[in-house]
Amino acid sequence: MAVSPKINRREHILQCLAQMLETSPGQRITTAKLASEVGVSEAALYRHFPSKARMFEGLIEFIEESLLSRINIIMDDEKDTMKRCQLMLQLLLIFAERNPGISRVLNGDALLGENERLRSRISSLFAKIETQLKQILREKTLREGRGFNLDEAILANLLLAFAEGRIAQFVRSEFKLKPTTHFDEQWRFIQHQLLQS
């Protein structure tokens, strides 16, 4: 029974951190401000997380688990190359839109001035997603008997850059310009261009 309140407090701390990232764009989150938001002392924060970097790592773990588990579901459920790519990009954009504070972590904006390993971890997550996109595009030849005229690594990079750009616009607009705005039309255009290559 003693473990449950600790888990709930940890989750509450992370939720407050994400909320502060959303409501205080451009501002650095200090442990003093976070403790005040959570309603505990700084010492109480450190009982649950040994450092602020560990708090951000908790958010990054949530991001990784959420995105990578859903990407695995897409891979299991969908076999069409273009549909897989569409669903993966849509997943990234919807996730960012539903979690504005966390989109600042995805974008790297919230990690400025923080431990380098946090930025490396986000970079690693995007590298995994890009690798998955590249693999999907390469499998098109095997699955559908026809590949692309452009290298799949270049195409995967283009697709991910599109999603990252939409997330960056969302953060830069202080969450007013939704990442999913016009996605369907944009995807139709992107897909048409990819299939022409």
UniProtKB/Swiss-Prot annotation:
Keywords: Cell cycle, Cell division, Coiled coil, Cytoplasm, DNA-binding. One of its GO terms (molecular function) is sequence-specific DNA binding. Residues 110-130 form a coiled coil. Its main location: cytoplasm. Residues 30-49 bind DNA. Homodimer. Interacts with FtsZ. This is Nucleoid occlusion factor SlmA.
